Every structure is written in C-alpha cells, then in structure tokens.
UniProtKB/Swiss-Prot annotation:
NCBIfam families named among the record's database cross-references: PS_II_psbM
GO annotation, biological process: photosynthesis, light reaction
UniProt subcellular location: Plastid, Cyanelle thylakoid membrane
Membrane topology: Single-pass membrane protein
Underlying gene: psbM
Descriptive protein name: Photosystem II reaction center protein M
Keywords annotated in UniProt: Cyanelle, Membrane, Photosynthesis, Photosystem II, Plastid, Reaction center, Thylakoid, Transmembrane, Transmembrane helix
Length: 38
C-alpha cells in the first residue's frame, strides 16, 4: 500500500486546524468566564 505524503499532510491539516480553532475558542470562553466571576 503506497502512502501519499500530500494526502497525509492534507488530512492532518484538515483535522488539526479545526480542532485547534475549537480549543482556542473554548479556552477563551473559560478564561473570560473566570474573569467575570472574580
């Protein structure tokens, strides 16, 4: 089975970019919520 490097990179980016975007949004939401509590 031949692995296509470009396909592998594209798949990795396709998974990593939305995941990191959601993580950043989540962290910002939690941080702002903690600031509002104080």
């Amino acid at each position: 089975m031949e692995v296509n490097i470009l396909g592998l990179i594209a798949t990795a980016l396709f998974i990593v970019i939305p995941t990191s975007f959601l993580l950043i949004l989540y962290i910002q939401t939690v941080a702002s919520a903690k600031q509002q509590e104080q």
